[in-house]
Amino acid sequence: MDHDYEKLGLKVGLEIHQQLNTKRKLFCNCPTKIRDDEPHGEIERVLRPSQSEMGHVDKAALLESKKEKKFIYQYYNDSTCLVELDDEPPHDVSPEAVDTALEVSTLMNMKMADEVQIMRKMVIDGSNTSGFQRTMFVSQEGFIETEYGNIGVTSLCLEEDACKKIEDGKDYTKYCVDRLGIPLLEITTEPDITSPKMGKEAARRIGTILRATGKVKRGLGTIRQDVNISIREGARIEVKGVQNLDLIEKIIENEVTRQISLNEIKEELLKRNAEVVDEIKDITELLKDTESKVLKSALKNKGVIRAILLKGFSGMIGREVQPGRRLGTEFSDRGKVLGGVGGLFHTDELPKYGITEEEVTKLKEYMNCGENDAVILVADKKNKVERALNAVIERAKESMIGIPEETRKALDDGNTSYLRPLPGAARMYPETDVPTITITEEKLEAIRNNLPEMPEEKLVRFVKEYELNEDLAKQMVMSYHVDLFESLSKKYSKIKPTLIATTLEATLKEIKREGLDTDLLTEEHLEELFKGLSEDKMSKEAVPDVIKGFIENPSKKLDEILEIKGMSSMSVDEVESIIEDIINQNISQVNEKGMGAMGLLMGRCMAQLRGKADGKLINTTLQKKLKEKVQ
């Protein structure tokens, strides 16, 4: 849907969270490696909120504690330690991570803190074993340049990443601590973004700056974007966990649509003098003989069915607020998160789900539901139903006031769902186990004198110096292999840089699409490959098959791979001899077609010589030998 974003007063700010590719974690010497093999053990914890330095308890933390969940943490003996398990004090902050934070701050024109104080940010959703995340403020008041103008950067913080979620059960959540403690940059922009396209461009530009350092991790989950969105007649909404850059635009568009729709619903409810009745009624007896599978299942498990009356809400609960999501979905989200129920039913969508028209009529009569009213019912354990319906009552009342400020989760379709209330400042307090870090002018001067080349500068250089076309140069500049490309191109000047670039960017992707695990291919393998190519041990046509050979046999050397694949390079004399044999074997076609037999013969030559000789050599030799025969 097209909106006039200027008229609506759209304001968007970004929070970019980027993992750093450091040798060690932020507060211990463990590697920053994510694992998927079997863990060596587990521990269990229960977390509770504590007061901030000012004596307040954060409402988001309080909400999490009410879920009464236990947390299970998986660990590895050889790559995680007692620091991650919160059984040992944190070590000193990683100097490499601090230097990277200062480098990125400089590239974004920011003012550095003289002294960095480590803080604790309360987080009791289980994603941190300690119940808090360690974070430190590094710099502020910077800006980035985009095609839409400058966008202010509020702050840059260096913090530890959270645990990796493995499983979410009804009364427990399981995490792995391998990700906990990986250094993470949090970059927060000013709300200077005024359109969805500008939001995407700002995130792209920050990502470009981060990648220019060569010190950030790549791949899914290594960068996460949170988007803060508001319009003039709306509220600030924080959307968490946007992992795809292309999704940012749609997230902003859909949130604006949602806020406009919720405002329209509010106006309609006020016209109707709508009212939310606080009383929760037990309707278990009324629907005890229902054939609805959901309701029968709840009753079979000793659950209850309860309902609330929303006066003036008829037709409103089923109204769409985002593509495929309705006001009823907003109510359901609250019930699911705060009550732990599977969902709810409302009379805008009934009869349905096995609930008959007769049962709906009985329900409306029992609830004194008028023509313009609506009923919401929930079936589950008594305590869950009570919590869920109280949450729905609160959300229904908010729908008559406007748009509640809240944190929402990004969904893959560009929509969002309720996560928790917006957190406040009450969850921050100083870290007492780690000393502060002094940022000296000498340190900053050293950083300024060693800033990386920016991608736009590198692009121009790659086109000029390596003679790459612009599309391939753009791919290479943004590639994880950019440093390897430059190293190989300089070391093996006999090989065209275009071949090295296409191998790293196109060939590896094609091989991965075939189902082979390209993660098994190391830089040492690629180094050996291009060294062999420069020494004429193989032809360039053999490159894909040799790469596959390394993946299939990671411990083998190039000579062994060439032998396994039957691709050892031939001498010119051997190539000429084989081509002469092929011409003689097809002499009748040569006599009939003359030089017109070139295509047929080339195919047969390549079938026998591919990977063993350079394609150009095969072509020129065949042309020469064929001309000799024809003449």
Swiss-Prot record:
GO molecular function: aminoacyl-tRNA ligase activity; ATP binding; glutaminyl-tRNA synthase (glutamine-hydrolyzing) activity
Gene Ontology biological process terms, A to Z: glutaminyl-tRNAGln biosynthesis via transamidation; translation
Keywords linked to the UniProt accession: ATP-binding, Ligase, Nucleotide-binding, Protein biosynthesis
GO cellular component: cytoplasm
Catalysis performed (reactions): L-glutamyl-tRNA(Gln) + L-glutamine + ATP + H2O = L-glutaminyl-tRNA(Gln) + L-glutamate + ADP + phosphate + H(+)
Top-level taxon of origin: Archaea
UniProt cross-references to Pfam families, sorted A to Z: GAD (PF02938), GatB_N (PF02934), GatB_Yqey (PF02637)
Enzyme Commission identifier(s): 6.3.5.-
Physiological role: Allows the formation of correctly charged Gln-tRNA(Gln) through the transamidation of misacylated Glu-tRNA(Gln) in organisms which lack glutaminyl-tRNA synthetase. The reaction takes place in the presence of glutamine and ATP through an activated gamma-phospho-Glu-tRNA(Gln). The GatDE system is specific for glutamate and does not act on aspartate.
Quaternary structure and partners: Heterodimer of GatD and GatE.
NCBIfam families registered for this protein in UniProt: gatE_arch, PRK04028.1
Family, per entry: Belongs to the GatB/GatE family. GatE subfamily.
Protein name (database record): Glutamyl-tRNA(Gln) amidotransferase subunit E
